[in-house]
Amino acid sequence: VGVYAMQIAMTEAFKMKLTVEEADAIFGRPMGIPKTGVFGLYDLIGIDLMADVLKSFIKELPKTDKFHEVAQEIPLIKKLIETGYTGRKGKGGFFRINKDGGAKILEALNLETGDYSPSKKIDIKSEKVDLKKLINRDDKYGKYAWSVISKIIKYASSLVTEITDEFNDIDEAMRLGFNWSKGPFEMLEEIGVENFFSKIDNYDGNKFLENLAKSKNENFYGERQKYTKIETLGKVKRKAQSIDGNSSAQIYQFKDYNIVEFTTKANALDYDSMDALKKATDKPLIIIN
């Protein structure tokens, strides 16, 4: 779901001719997503590593999975990888730091020309606006937000019963795994069930959405689960025993589980990071950075 969300945010930005700054400004804090957005997150993870992730999903997911619709190779991304622009760990990516002349200037990639120019700060005046207002805006930002959010909700809901029987498990995975402040179904509840269904064209055979539309239940989520305070991983790590590691990650053992801590610049993932994860999977695993 998380990778699908990244891909739909990227492909829609290309389709709607948004700049990378505009896309990240919308697919970011206004939607309860970290400020790296989509293009900044691609740079952080590594554009080449994301290409490998997509190839893996294309190979493993059934042909009927709608992920395939957003996983096609983009020529500009292929060119970036071939020329060493793999993100923060490389010469740059969708963003880069230009040090010519002594000053450090943040530059952004033009998705149409492939050229760099000084990055522009985008103020869409939606930092404190709720999702319902954001998707109802009658401008390119509102149209982009709605297109991305609606497709994420459709995709996530199509996986209910296939990957989990409880839809809130998907929300929790997105909060914990991608650091979103709200998952797809929490977004749906914030948008409003009636408002959502008034804006979509069809259910695409989605049983979850069909049943929800029939129920007309605006508060389908119910009461949220409350969590008790737990010990931080930073404190746990200080008590753990270092058992292995490499230039990109360190492996610790604590009680009956392993901990992997990434140590690369900006926590960028590379092949040594993946090797450390592979070595640590003989026990229950916690990943920190």
Model-derived features: positions:
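N-terminal glycine-rich phosphate-binding loop for ADP-containing cofactors
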Residues: 1-288
